[in-house]
């Protein structure tokens, strides 16, 4: 197997006397979808916050593309190709749908403050490239005809797709989705599942936290199970649903 794009080694996070994440080891690979499941409060979102730099580990290290990113600030981690969404959708309500996606196109590599300030020819060319890219992404998620509308005009499921389109605009190598199906009805969840499946690419890895078992089991190449901050299992979806420790900790009698 190729080298992992993300390698988490012995990562622990304490908040006072609370052990939120306890000695987690994980490898994530390009072209794969890594599912992460566990009960509420298990440490899943804390793990995402550690990877994205919002929290710093108490112990352990995180490497991305072979580089130690453990102590980098969130914006530096983002620039290296790690992009995430959140449980609660975070869109710019006062910007159009198109402008929301264009925000994701801007990064340190292609932006020059003076070019933007004086609206130079180079800036205008770059802005047109960003607009074309944003339009292409909106077309992909079925929102191009609504590009000049405001995000609040969209139903919940489409707002979630818009948030993912904005994340994709920055060309991530690792896309982290935190409960993307939360609050969706059955039809919206089916459409989201198909959309996430369409995102699989040899050039990008996806990490997926999700409570909808049907979604996470149908999409994931591998599933990592956390309970009380500890890993209790890691295997294929087919094996995870048969694991007694997982059933006791999380799945219960739920039909998956």
Question: Model-predicted segments: where are they?
Answer:
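Glycine-rich phosphate-binding loops of nucleotide-dependent enzymes
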Residues: 2-256
